[in-house]
């Protein structure tokens, strides 16, 4: 019997290799991942997939930043409480201050420490228990 699929996650990063690597890791843990190379694509995916339960976004991207995405989410009534995790290779104190104000769940420095990320996700979304009926 296949394991039930866990929550839908949206991964936003202009580095598509990073998105694919993270998606592979998280799908191996049972999550369903959508990837977006930009804020524009991320917003489109959020509209198309209302069951997305969490966003993991890079902080710095060429067209629009992760902070811009989070601000848009917080202004959108149906998505204002959507949990967001931010990743960054170089966040400064001003970024951290903005992220705290925007009620970000966590900030991970790149390269992402996968064990800690999985702990965070498993605490937020406990793995479904699969019960096997005995004979």
Where are these predicted regions, by residue range?
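The feature encodes the CheY-like receiver
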Residues: 19, 61-63, 92
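Charged docking surfaces used in two-component/phosphorelay signaling
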Residues: 20-28
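Alpha4 helix (beta4-alpha4-beta5 surface) of REC/receiver domains from two-component response regulators
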Residues: 68, 80, 91-107, 119
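Acidic catalytic/metal-coordinating carboxylates
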Residues: 37-41, 65-68
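Active-site beta3 strand of CheY-like receiver
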Residues: 50-56
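C-terminal output helix
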Residues: 112-121
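Short amphipathic alpha-helix used as the core "switch/output" element in two-component signaling
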Residues: 44, 67-80
